[in-house]
Design a protein with these regions (language model features):
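Short Gly/Pro-enriched turn/cap motifs at secondary-structure boundaries
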Residues: 207-209, 253-258, 279-280, 393-404
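Glycine-rich loop(s) and the adjacent beta-strand/alpha-helix scaffold that form part
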Residues: 120-127, 135, 139, 167-246
Length: 404
């Protein structure tokens, strides 16, 4: 509610200042990172989002292996982390002198790291935050119990006074001097809780680590905690899945590389668009779930043409990819010579999909999306392609073959 937002705004700066002064946790403001909620009073182009400063994990010694790596799909060359600005350069390393310099600056140290480490030691984003927090705890000589899952919260006269955890040395009873903080992750891999709390169509996959089984939530509810009734109490990402040859399931979030770029639309089982594809990943899914009440929108399909997929990529298919046979063979993407044929292959209404493409192509000329306002707001346009006009988020779907 409002009081929680006020508490966050009031206390957030104090938290950042204290971490900066007393720990190795350092943040930098993202100068170009528009607000996700658009057309609101005070909307800003950047400066609000804070990102952890890149961290050299070599200082962790053997504890570096305790930092859970990102999903394999998120790392380049088998173990290299990059931030968003670097990613743009690495995707087109020879397009400019600046891109070439950035690529060499990132790639050469990585190859040196791999002579000794299982992956690159330069951590960015969430991994950098975890690494900096762990290093700070080590500097303060804080005792950390690994492999010690929570089993039960201890209650005395209606107040939580401690916890029981399983450790490598057996079950331990811990009495807290001040309080117990539940920081055990969400419920992403708890089938019963997902079935209870998540909408239909969102219960199968997650980007969260598989250790996120809702232990904190379950134990909190047992001692009288209450779960609020917010409409969307989780973070949604539109994802595609691909079963790898080794049997593992790759889950790819469609965040910035494809969904917001000109020349792509998202449609439901009726072949109709249902949302502004360029809105934030969370808002995209909120719109998708809302549309589910009228038309089957989970799963949905991303539709593009040959020119788009080679310029921007599509999900796991990176920009510039020349060979799509592997992805076609395993059904990650579907290819067709015409939009109607594509509709028939994926099982959506062919006439409606054709009309959705016709309308999109008209919007590409006028620069105005009359259905969902695609390309309005700072964030929409920032994630588009500034070289395309009149709207950086809308482009024609014309060049066969077509893909879903």
């Amino acid at each position: 509610g409002e009081h929680l937002r006020e508490a966050f705004l009031r206390s957030g700066p104090d938290m950042v200042a204290e971490l900066d002064a007393k720990t190795a946790v350092k943040f930098a403001a993202a100068l170009a990172h528009p607000d996700y909620v658009k057309n609101q009073p005070g909307e800003a182009f950047g400066g609000r989002a804070l990102a952890p400063v890149a961290f050299d994990a070599k200082v962790l010694g053997d504890d570096f292996d305790r930092v859970l790596p990102p999903r394999p799909e998120f790392m380049g060359l088998g173990g290299m982390m990059v931030n968003r600005n670097e990613l743009s350069a690495l995707l087109r390393p020879v397009s400019s002198v600046g891109n070439a310099k950035t690529t060499l600056k990132v790639v050469l140290p990585y190859f040196k790291d791999r002579l000794k480490y299982k992956r690159g030691t330069r951590l960015v984003m969430g991994n950098a935050l975890v690494g900096r927090l762990l290093y700070s705890l080590k500097q303060y000589q804080t005792e950390i119990w690994y492999e010690a899952p929570l089993q039960e919260l201890l209650l005395e006269e209606g107040r939580v006074i401690g916890a029981i955890v399983d450790t490598v040395n057996g079950r331990q009873r811990i009495i807290a001097r001040k309080g117990v903080v539940l920081a055990t992750g969400g419920v992403a891999w708890n089938p019963a809780l997902r079935q209870q709390y998540f909408p239909v169509g969102t219960r199968d996959y997650s980007l969260a680590p598989q250790l996120s089984t809702g232990d904190g939530l379950s134990n909190g509810l047992k001692v009288g905690a209450k779960l609020d009734n917010e409409d969307h109490p989780v973070l949604w990402f539109p994802c595609s899945t691909f079963k790898k040859p080794n049997g593992q399931m790759a889950v790819w979030p469609h965040i910035i590389l494809d969904r917001a770029k000109p020349g792509l639309i998202a449609v439901n089982a009726s072949g109709k668009r249902f949302v502004n594809e360029t809105d934030s990943y969370h808002d995209f899914c909120v719109g998708q779930l809302a549309a589910q009440h009228n038309n089957a929108s989970t799963p949905a399909y991303l539709i593009c043409d040959d020119a788009f997929i080679h310029k921007y990529g599509l999900g796991l298919i990176m920009p510039g990819a020349q060979k799509l046979k592997h992805y076609l063979k395993h059904g990650y993407v579907v290819q067709a010579a015409t939009v109607r044929e594509l509709a028939n292959k994926i099982g959506v209404d062919a006439h409606e999909l054709e009309q959705s493409v016709v309308r999109n192509n008209a919007y590409a000329i006028t620069g105005e999306d009359l259905e969902f306002g695609r390309g309005t707001g700072k964030m929409n346009r920032f994630n588009g392609d500034a070289a395309i006009g009149p709207n950086p988020c809308i482009g024609p779907i014309l060049t066969a073959p077509f893909y879903a």
